[in-house]
Amino acid sequence: MNNIIKMLNEEQMKQDVPEFGAGDTVVVKVRVVEGGKERLQAFEGVVIAKRNRGVHSAFTVRKISNGEGVERAFQIHSPIISSIEVKRRGRVRRAKLYYLRERSGKSARIREKLATK
């Protein structure tokens, strides 16, 4: 019984998910259906949390839109996610960046992780 559940979970997992973590700036392309038409909607922001639970893995992205903070949670292996693109790697010391909710402007900046040779 346990092996069957494990096999079903592995079938549903996407293989083309890039490596990313808290502090990284990502662009998530989401499939949106409007009036019978399907289009891709891009949501770009900073990953403030990531939860690794196999098929149930999820992450939260935060961006500032018109001066207002917007957060959106995504399931990594969801069929509505078309692609995830990592724009910038951030250097942070925390796994969850919930403190960014209270900050704005320069205090909400995240240092960039430089590529190692």
Swiss-Prot record:
InterPro entries cross-referenced by the UniProt entry = Ribosomal_bL19, Ribosomal_bL19_CS, Ribosomal_bL19_sf, Translation_prot_SH3-like_sf
Q: Which UniProt keywords apply?
A: Ribonucleoprotein, Ribosomal protein
Q: Name one GO cellular component term.
A: cytosolic large ribosomal subunit
Q: Which GO terms describe its molecular function?
A: structural constituent of ribosome
Keyword Zinc-finger belongs to the record: no
Q: Name one GO biological process term.
A: translation
Biological role:
This protein is located at the 30S-50S ribosomal subunit interface and may play a role in the structure and function of the aminoacyl-tRNA binding site.
Q: Which family is this sequence assigned to?
A: Belongs to the bacterial ribosomal protein bL19 family.
Name of the protein this chain belongs to:
Large ribosomal subunit protein bL19
Instruction: State the taxonomy lineage.
Output: Bacteria, Pseudomonadati, Pseudomonadota, Gammaproteobacteria, Alteromonadales
